[in-house]
Amino acid sequence: MPRPGAESKNSTNMVGIVVVGHGRLAEEMVRTLEGVLGQVDALEAVVNEPADPGERVRARIEEAARRVDRGRGVLILSDMLGDTETNQALAFAQTSGAEVVAGVNMPMLIKLANARKQTDARALAGLLRRYGQEHIVWATEAPAVVRKAQ
């Protein structure tokens, strides 16, 4: 996981990213992303325990958002719609202007790491939704994908 608030000379003027999910899922997704791309600035995972009350989850999201904000807004990615983490992210978004996308997957994170200097959080949320959906594939029913793998 990147160090909280990690900054470099290249980390200004980009969309800040907070990944939130059940248990340690967000932390592991960020760790995997950084295993592929190296350290990603202005990116933070929020870890929640099953017994954490909603207020504690929201406080962690708020703190992480403050640390990753680099001037182009904050995008919060959650694991699924309707859970405590997403609901608390949405409550925070109502007062902060952050954007929230539920249903995060690895292709979305990789795209995000490479596209967030080119746009703002709202436009990036729309791009990620489309990109994430395009990369959910019934692989055994996609012969071209299977042939490429062989």
Where are these regions (language model features)?
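N-terminal loops that bind phosphate or other acidic moieties
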Residues: 2-150
